[in-house]
Amino acid sequence: MKVLDRSAFKKTINVYSIEIKPNQINNLNKCLKNYYFKNRRCKITEEKISDNVKLFLNPALIKNFDDFSENTKIELKNLGITKDMFSNEIITLDYDYWKLNEVLKAILPKDEPPLTSYSIIGHIVHLNLKDHLIDYKYIIAEVLKDKVSVAKTVVNKTNKIDNVYRNFEMEVLCGEPDFIASVIEYDTKFEFDFSKVYWNPRLSTEHNRIVNLVNHGDVLFDVFAGVGPFSIRAAKKNCLVHANDLNPDSFKWLNHNINLNKKAKGWITTYNKDGSDFILNDFKSNMLKIWSDSNFLGQIHVVMNLPAKALSFLKYFKGLFDEQDLKEIKKDHLEKHLPIIYCYFFAKKDESLDEIFKTHLEYKFDENEYEFNFVRNVSNGKNMHRVTFQMPLSILMIDNSDISEPLPKRISKSLKAKTKAKEYTGNLKKIKETLNKNISKIDSDFLKLQNDISKKKEKPDDK
């Protein structure tokens, strides 16, 4: 079936039923509740007949009185319920009765994998249909709109998320092309245009994990903030947040959502930049302010949720600070407040997470200095992971050969080294000049010798 025919789902069945007075229901429930024909949207478990109520029993369990267990028969007898009070009745089940998976099972090919998942974003049902289901996309969408109570619009993703803004093209299969979605994640409301920004409801648990690590007095840098699932909830905990996203639509809805959630206002500064620019400039300048504040007692968190590319942005932390930047900062205060990085990435199931991570950062961590966490399955061959680690000062510094020494001492050594280097350069220049002069003299003497030998050969033999 490729065109939905709701009438095809009508079915008549024979059910065992009993008509009783309303005041008998509670007592009868005690012995018959496990036998009731369960209600599914349509009211067939019970039907009011004048002042009485008719109860229907599940035909898969009870077809006649003899199907009751002996204990149930005794309980019915004690309630004054006899066999004569039961009867068989024909009822009709229509399209509304059947569950979503039952309808899809009836209309889709039996020899192909079924529809396994879909996402709900406000009133939007989002599909990512496999190739073998494309021919059935419209009927699938229609059934979803019927059976998912909040559904008003059903869309299918038509391309991969491979553009710089992380959104994707989609096709409206059923309903109105209304993409302004409203969702509540835990205690926070978000609104956005789903066709222009990235939102994945399957990440709500991961958002919550990170937010639970953030406390009042902390600072969070959200490098790829999107519409704010990490940032806004962190700000509501009175954590100072710097939230950045390159996508102008994400930036727009990020600010909109800050206004929606009043508790977050005043705690977030927003940026509309490339992640590299944000790290090289805004992260750096704000880190220097934090490190310069001897009263700062919190933790610094950096969230990098761009799994397709986030690892490649780690290089922008390398050598971000030089000795001149840090000369006024106390070393012990600095080392107590190094940023904790939460970086997301994709990996094929047969790939080494260690190799992927270390290749991008090119730093030899000890095993206990970083941690991998599985986030979700993306496809049959790919998973999403998070690596969590504290960024070493030796990565953040340009010249880290003497990182263990106090900063003033290192600066002094650096200046001495520069002076010595100049001396060595001058000496090398002198040596080179002397060597060149010697080589020229040797060449000149050699040419003179050749000329003398040549002249002797030209003289006649006196003998």
Swiss-Prot record:
InterPro entries from the UniProt entry: MeTrfase_TRM5/TYW2 (IPR030382), SAM-dependent_MTases_sf (IPR029063), TRM5-TYW2-like_MTfase (IPR056743), TRM5/TYW2-like_N (IPR056744), tRNA_Gua_MeTrfase_euk (IPR025792)
Pfam families in the record: TRM5-TYW2_MTfase (PF02475), TYW2_N_2 (PF25133)
KW S-adenosyl-L-methionine (keyword) present: yes
GO MF assignments: tRNA (guanine(37)-N1)-methyltransferase activity
GO cellular component, one term: nucleus
Family per record: Belongs to the class I-like SAM-binding methyltransferase superfamily. TRM5/TYW2 family.
Protein name: tRNA (guanine(37)-N(1))-methyltransferase
